[in-house]
A protein has these predicted regions:
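Hydrophobic alpha-helical segments and helix pairs
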Residues: 98-153
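Protein kinase-like catalytic core scaffold
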Residues: 126, 211, 233-234, 279, ...
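Extreme N-terminal starter segment of soluble prokaryotic enzymes
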Residues: 1-4
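Conserved N-proximal alpha/beta basic substrate-recognition cap immediately N-terminal to
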Residues: 8-117, 121-122
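Generic beta-strand structural signal
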Residues: 108, 227-228, 285
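Short glycine-rich, flexible loops that bind phosphorylated cofactors or substrates
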Residues: 55-57, 135, 300
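C-terminal active-site "lid" helix and adjoining low-complexity regulatory extension at the edge
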Residues: 253-258, 272-273, 285-334
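Phosphate-binding site of ATP-dependent enzymes
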Residues: 143-262, 266
Length: 334
């Protein structure tokens, strides 16, 4: 089998390429952004493309390209089942509800009138989210009905940008203050107050819907579990200081004793039901029981190098280092 790999430095592709070289797997580098990409992969049996939600080009075409090649008979990563809901919290709401999986209660409205009526009838606080964004970007707490109305008015007015300039700056500043970023990173965040990203310039504003989730109090951490081909590993993320969000905090615990096997079991159940090649699942807890917040097919590479082991589907623990990106290649070759 010959694999075509789109190479994006810093992504899964670094380790895919290294693993193919190490194991003597036939591969070629292709450029998914070229108009002739279908021709580029014509002599290959598989195509691998770690597309990113922060690149406007990927948002425009990556899922469509992958699905087209999959329909043409090629093996692809990520395949349609794995990635159609990527960076789409509204899509994930429908998917998890239809699959009967435990999730944080979520609400979506497509008219201002329906949203405002719901606000009058519900309790607060509620968590407001845009359908896209990672690392707690575009996630805010509506403490009161008035705050929720302001989000609704924006969503059905001029809309909201997926890139929050002030939020990005504060994110970098807080990470620097906690030792998780450099001063140069803070300066880059400051520059973004005046210079938007390429994505922000090219992507239209989010409008015409609002999405809320119940706020689950008393969570000092969340658990993220990643499942690839019947193997699972996990991390514990500590909630930010004076905040309710853990994603993107940079405060991570890896010891097996810090992790929760009930989340791992639920993750294996999700993998089985959704037939995904790779899925990262974020959990919070209500009355001691895990609830899914959201999903992703992708994850940052470096933070998981510190994981001390993984589980197999029989819930056996396997101590020691591992290479999840290599698992993805092996899954595609199987």
């Amino acid at each position: 089998m010959k694999i075509a790999i789109h190479n994006r430095p810093g992504s899964f592709s670094d380790r895919w390429i290294a693993y193919c070289k190490e194991k003597g797997i036939d591969y070629k580098i292709v450029n998914a952004y070229n108009s002739d990409i279908v021709d580029q992969v014509s002599d290959c049996d598989a195509f691998m493309f770690h597309h990113h939600h922060g690149d406007y080009r990927d948002v425009l075409f990556a899922k469509q390209l992958l699905y087209s090649l999959e329909e043409a008979g090629k093996k692809v990563f990520p395949d349609w089942r794995t990635c159609w809901h990527f960076d789409d919290k509204v899509g994930q709401k429908y998917l998890l509800e239809a699959a009967g999986l435990p999730m944080v209660q979520s609400y979506v409205f497509y008219t201002k009138e329906e949203a405002l009526t719901w606000i009058e009838q519900t309790s607060f606080p509620k968590v407001f989210k845009l359908r896209g964004g990672a690392g707690s970007a575009n996630v805010k707490l509506a403490h009161t009905a008035n705050e929720a109305r302001r989000f609704v008015n924006k969503a059905f007015g001029k809309g909201l940008s997926q890139f929050n300039r002030s939020g990005y700056f504060l994110e970098r500043y807080n990470k620097w203050r906690n030792g998780n970023d450099t001063f140069m990173g803070v300066m880059k965040g400051f520059a973004r107050l005046f210079l938007p990203t390429e994505y922000a310039k090219m992507h239209s504003r989010e409008k015409g819907y609002v999405y809320f989730q119940d706020f689950i109090p008393n969570n000092s951490y969340d658990i993220r579990v990643i499942v690839i081909d019947g193997k699972a590993f996990a991390i514990k993320r500590i909630v930010r200081e004076n905040d309710f969000r853990a994603s993107g905090s940079g405060k991570i615990l890896y010891a097996r004793s810090e992790l929760r096997e009930d989340c791992v079991r639920c993750s294996f159940e999700l993998e089985e039901k959704l037939k995904t090649q790779c899925v990262a699942i974020d959990f919070v807890f209500k009355d001691g029981k895990p609830l899914i917040v959201e999903l992703s097919y992708a994850f940052a590479v470096a933070p998981y190098d510190k994981c001390v082991g993984y589980w197999t589907k029989d819930m056996q623990w396997h101590e020691g280092p591992f290479n999840p990106e290599a698992w993805i290649v092996d899954c595609l070759l199987a």
